[in-house]
């Protein structure tokens, strides 16, 4: 899959809580040894891989397909990949008002472990805190 195809899928999945990445960001991601772009049908994730940690920078499902359990299935695959990779834990940030995503992460035993004040800018331009969540894999 080309970097442009990854980017176009990302644009279908992005929502008001997402960090906005550009095509140039995706080109840098493809060259990085520590960044992995995972794709599964109409889902995409951007992961940072370090010694014993996987950080989910972005995970999304195409808007037209949300509410069908695809995000849960994809997250389960990311967790399995992280275990195979040898990670001890997974971290991510989620908007404080993104209740569906917070509930999904909690259902996989992610726990809240911090807050990033004014981390996201939503479509109206106002700021929103992000909750840092962590899943221990051991």
Where are the language model's segments positioned?
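Terminal substrate-recognition subdomain of acyl/acetyltransferases
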Residues: 125-138
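Short glycine/proline-centered loop/turn elements that form peptide/ligand docking sites
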Residues: 71, 75, 97-101, 118-124
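Acetyl-CoA-dependent GNAT
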Residues: 6-64, 72-77, 81, 85, ...
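Active-site acidic-Proline motif in GNAT/NAT acetyltransferases
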Residues: 62-68, 96-97
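Conserved catalytic-core motifs of GNAT/GCN5-like acyltransferases
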Residues: 93, 106, 111-126
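Structural preference for long, well-ordered alpha-helical segments within the folded cores
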Residues: 77, 104-107
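Conserved hydrophobic beta-strand within the GNAT/NAT acetyltransferase core sheet
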Residues: 56, 90-94
């Amino acid at each position: 899959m080309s970097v442009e195809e990854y980017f176009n899928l990302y644009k279908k999945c992005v929502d008001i809580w997402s960090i906005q990445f550009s095509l140039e960001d995706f080109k840098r991601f493809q060259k990085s040894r520590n960044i992995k772009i995972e794709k599964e049908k109409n889902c995409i994730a951007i992961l940072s891989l370090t010694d014993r940690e996987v950080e989910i920078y972005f995970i999304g499902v195409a808007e037209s397909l949300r509410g069908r359990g695809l995000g849960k299935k994809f997250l389960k695959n990311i967790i399995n990949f992280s275990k195979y990779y040898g990670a001890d834990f997974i971290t991510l940030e989620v908007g404080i008002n993104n209740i569906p995503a917070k509930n999904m992460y909690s259902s996989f035993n992610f726990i809240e472990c911090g807050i990033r004040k004014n981390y996201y800018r939503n479509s109206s331009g106002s700021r929103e805190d992000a909750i840092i969540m962590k899943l221990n894999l051991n």
